[in-house]
Amino acid sequence: MTEAGNNYSEKKTQLHISVRNLVEFIFREGDIDNRSSRAMSADAMMEGTRIHRKIQGSMGKEYQAEVPLSLVVEGDLYELTVEGRADGIFTEDGKCFVDEIKGMYRRVELFEKPVFVHRAQAMCYAYIFALQNNMETIGIQMTYCNLETEQTKYFREEFSFEEIKKWFDDLMEEYGKWATFQCEMKNKRQASIKELNFPFEYRPGQKKLVSDVYRTIMRQKLLFMQAPTGVGKTISTIFPAVKAVGEELADRIFYLTAKTITATVAKETFALLEKNGYRAKTIQITAKEKLCPCDEMECNPVTCPYAKGHFDRVNDAVFDLLHRCEMIERDDILSQADRYTVCPFELCLDTASWCDNVICDYNYVFDPNVYLKRFFQEGIKGDYIFLIDEAHNMVERSRQMYSAQVYKEDFLTVKRIMKEHSRSIEKALEKCNKILLGMKRECGNYTVYDTFGNMVFSFMRLMTLLDEFLQKANEFPGKKDVMDFYFELRNFLNIYDLVDEHYVMYSELEADGRFMLKLFCVDPSLNIQKRLDKGKSAVFFSATFLPVNYYKSLLSTKKDNYAIYADSTFDSKKRLLAMATDVSTRYTRRSRSEYERIAGYINAVVTQKIGNYMVFFPSYKMMNDVADIYCEKYADETELMLQKNNMSEAEREEFLDRFSEESDRTLVAFGIMGGIFGEGIDLKNDRLIGAIVVGTGLPQISNERTILKDYYDAENGCGFDYAFRYPGINKVLQAAGRVIRTTEDTGVILLLDERFWQREYDLLYPREWSDRKPCNIANVGKLVADFWEQI
């Protein structure tokens, strides 16, 4: 391969790789080993933006910080852009150095030499800079800085241009077969997309939907789409995204969803396009616990043969798998892992790096602990399209991902374990515990703080000591607890680095007596936007995306995002939507008489037609209380089934299997709004013919909800809406949406709470609910009977 400067050829395929991904991919070797904190330290080095800024700011005005560098390397069929961002470039005594900064919790004075891949990263930047500036010599500086003490250690090396050029040429030679393969794969993909047509006849309004998505991608914007059930949202987002890739508007599609069923639909949609001539690599990332072949996920060469020598074999395993499979399934990953004796989960992640379409959970893109660093860790914008399904889940999920907490009691647990192993760690834990004890004594129910400053410095000191100890530690009783604590504390400190005006820091004395400190991300919009900025465009879509301005404000910081409402193709005459006017689930109204009325409503609906019904409650307590009354009064008329807390996968499947289309007795299933059956289940046709939603779904009052309310009262005067009403109505809409899954379905939806007729709720309903009807306990039976008669 030869360098082509930055003059692109029109004939050759354009490829890209980051400097970091290049060196980590080529130079990895040896075992997976989670027994020490070495792997953890590598992650810690990726953090520490505060240290980066501080070091860069202290180096004087001649120091250039965050210097973007790129080089086009020419192959026979392709031009490969190698790109990245050097932490710093400076000149000293007439010599030029490229600086690579790494923050960590380890004591830097213990470093005898730089980490190999860090050195290789700096050498890549040094070569590019030397080549583009006609330099005869170039130096690199590795700057390691302790995040707690800010103690710094430097390593310097100097190279002639000939030396560093030979090193870089050898590196690119090693990567050559991968670049050639990627080029051939991309050319096949692009040619196939040109000939690809929409695989169905367009439904009414669907062609406009496809055009809106394509236009969003073309303009590199964000789109928020309210997409009612039945509009074909999966194909209507995937197809235009694929066509956009064919037009070189992007290079990779991430389809993100929190539910297995929607991931399966996405996979089936890509497979359908493949049957129609589309040629691309598609993979669904499976959770580690579902891929790990071991009873315990102990990722080390002693307990797991797949971990021993994993990095020596995994590149060959990936190369072989990519040559054999287009649609890469879980079974393909498992069999390939067996064939090459490599970790199936790591194989899955590595294979995803070479795939055109990646179907995965939100956390693989957004979670700061889990995100796919091979795609998102560099400061370079990727050619990615994000298709984010069931996006109403993103608000709460992102709050969880960008928040962190620690418990005082865990410090004491680890202190007892470490007493036998390290006096210095025991003392550091004792110091942290004393600080937490003082905060606990001052805390009533919960306390909000402006800063955790002094305490965080004590946590950093503890992290340094733990990191050093775990580097050398063999097995000892309680080590797993210590490792878990290490991860929790490290996450807390990493999240603390993100804390700004979008966070609330508070302590809470929980009901069981445990004392918690929390960094609560009340507004995740900035953190999400930073990750979205790593791609070209994003489409958020959901069947329950109302009010859309609420989601726009919490999922992005941009003010020029698009929003559309896809027209429903469903015939509203095939669905009865009724809302009660004479029942309430307010706390002040909850009583046996009110529960008897609710049970009466349920019976009046389900006895009009034999079939399967679901009733959704705001809590297990109310569900059980109403179930007792329902059994007393109506047990002989129907079969009753209740959702249980913490159901296993097998129990969930058994629950859903009871919903048969061919039944001669009515089944009534009680479940929880917002729970495992409240959304994400797909009971089509006559498997479910009615849903009754009890209450407005308001989250239970808690300290966290109070903090949210106070924050948004101050922010925009909508505290109750943001903390309670909007999350509640989403659960209601999701539960109601279990009935109508296709344009052929028929069914009854009944909402039981007089508050549903208030103006505040009236403004939140989808357009398709304009035909809602009032009802009461006296006439609801006739209303439902008349509906079934006209059907």
Give the positions of each predicted feature:
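Conserved RecA-like P-loop NTPase helicase motor core
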Residues: 581-593, 644-757
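A substrate-engagement module of RecA-like helicase motors
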Residues: 190, 196, 249-358, 363-366, ...
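Conserved pre-motif I regulatory segment
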Residues: 184-226
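Metal-dependent nuclease catalytic cores that hydrolyze phosphodiester bonds in DNA/RNA
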Residues: 1-96, 120
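Walker A/P-loop
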Residues: 218-240
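A contiguous, basic/glycine-rich beta-loop/short-helix subdomain that forms a polymer-engagement track
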Residues: 333-353, 358, 369-376, 469-584, ...
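Mg2+/Mn2+-dependent nuclease catalytic core
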Residues: 71-165
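Signature of the SF2 helicase/ATPase Hel1-core->accessory helical subdomain module
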Residues: 237, 264, 338-357, 361-464, ...
